């Protein structure tokens, strides 16, 4: 089990807030007070530090959809490809393999947490989520 950092907490909240606490796959609404029913799902798992805090790598999914896409990786890939489009999907795959980017994220995890804490206010004002790296 990976340790949940402040950066993870604020990044996850930003992803769910940007989705208006609605599952991006099935449309189920999970109000903020029930936000534990909505996960921040990573296409490339959280262990892949190079894209752990990358908005293109994260989707707000209800628990049911999160379990489903985890059990059906081909459908998960198709869902993410449709969401991002071919160019952004390929760019995400390339960033996922960038080891220097992963090392940077590990070194700067506290700064990443501060960044997403600030981003949360912008997202709540309707602005798009901006990544850190």
What do the predicted segments below correspond to?
Residues 24-59:
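Histidine-centered nuclease catalytic patch
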């Amino acid at each position: 089990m990976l340790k949940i950092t402040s950066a993870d907490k604020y990044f996850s909240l930003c992803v769910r807030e940007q989705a208006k606490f609605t599952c991006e796959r099935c449309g189920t609404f999970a109000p903020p007070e029930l936000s534990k029913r909505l996960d921040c799902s990573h296409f490339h798992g959280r262990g892949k530090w190079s894209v752990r805090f990358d908005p293109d790598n994260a989707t707000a999914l209800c628990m049911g959809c999160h379990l489903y896409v985890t059990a059906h990786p081909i459908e998960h890939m198709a869902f993410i490809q449709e969401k991002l489009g071919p160019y952004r999907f390929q760019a995400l795959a390339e960033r996922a393999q960038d080891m220097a980017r992963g090392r940077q994220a590990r070194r700067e995890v506290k700064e990443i947490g501060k960044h997403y804490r600030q981003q949360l206010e912008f997202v709540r004002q309707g602005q798009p989520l901006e990544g850190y790296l």
